[in-house]
Amino acid sequence: MIKKRNTTKISVIGAGSVGATTAYALMLSGVATEIVLVDVNKSKTEGEAMDLSHGADFVKPVNILSGDYKDTEGSDIVVITAGAAQKVGETRLQLINKNINIFKSIIPEVVKYNKDAILLVVSNPVDVLSYVTYKLSGFPKERVIGSGTVLDTSRLKHEIGKRYKIDPRNVNTYIMGEHGDSEIATWSVTNIQNIKIDEYANKENLEYNDNFRKEVYENVKNAAYEVINRKGATFYAIALAVTRIVKAILGDEKTILPVSTLVENYYGIKDVYLGMPCIVGGSGIEKALSIDLNKTEASKLVKSAETLKNTLNNASCL
């Protein structure tokens, strides 16, 4: 449990597009009094810290530093965004061997100075790397969290909201499983302000059929690829997703977010990190929720878990 105190320290490992934008989003949110940026490119972190610090007059007081692992000591949360970037046409799972090797050098250094921190993994493939972090750190599963399908879920809400012309915040739904190509949309539990989506669509004379579900799902699943094809990388939305998770932890909100967590017995799935609805609070992941899926969704989730397990088993650098 993160103890309430006058200062809050967050370290961000990796100062690429995602890491730097995450630091910016955290700065704007006002959740931290100190943000430390660490990267192999020291000049880059120095430049990012300088640029961010020059805006200190416009936000709540925050000290932004460029440092090394020693400077992260005593962090409440360590956000890990370091790793090779996903290239055009490259899947998240194809990144695995590059990023596992990077994590083998990062995680021991993070743990050395942060025995009590919560580790929030953002680097892709996030579910696999969350599991790797869990194993390398020796931390309890509650304190090793992946950003999971928080962003994917936001994309799904956005797609439904756009088509139905409603506030996406009124859409209750989840993307579960891998943050990637095998993720699943939980249509069976999707509702609009507690009205089941099929009932809502029927009442409002809106489209809701197999074609609708397929189009929406494909748009969500391929969203990152579409962004990468156009601008080279995704970073704004994931930075906001990470900030949302951080706020839930630091505020001990006990809110439900579909983060990546160690699944131990859910539809027969064991020993793998997956995006699951979890209660997130001051202790990290306080509980993973075993929501009831229909047979098709459950089968797809099992396959998603198998995909991730096979990737881990086939990783040449483990």
Swiss-Prot record:
What SUPFAM superfamilies does its record include? LDH C-terminal domain-like (SSF56327), NAD(P)-binding Rossmann-fold domains (SSF51735)
Q: An example Gene Ontology cellular component term from the record?
A: cytoplasm
Q: Does the keyword Transmembrane apply?
A: no
**InterPro entries, sorted:** L-lactate/malate_DH (IPR001557), L-lactate_DH (IPR011304), L-lactate_DH_AS (IPR018177), Lactate/malate_DH_C (IPR022383), Lactate/malate_DH_N (IPR001236), Lactate_DH/Glyco_Ohase_4_C (IPR015955), NAD(P)-bd_dom_sf (IPR036291)
Its source organism is Clostridium botulinum (strain Kyoto / Type A2)
> What superkingdom heads the lineage?
Bacteria
| Keywords recorded for this protein, A-Z | Cytoplasm, NAD, Oxidoreductase, Phosphoprotein
- E.C. number: 1.1.1.27
The identity of this protein, by name, is L-lactate dehydrogenase
Its subcellular locations are: Cytoplasm
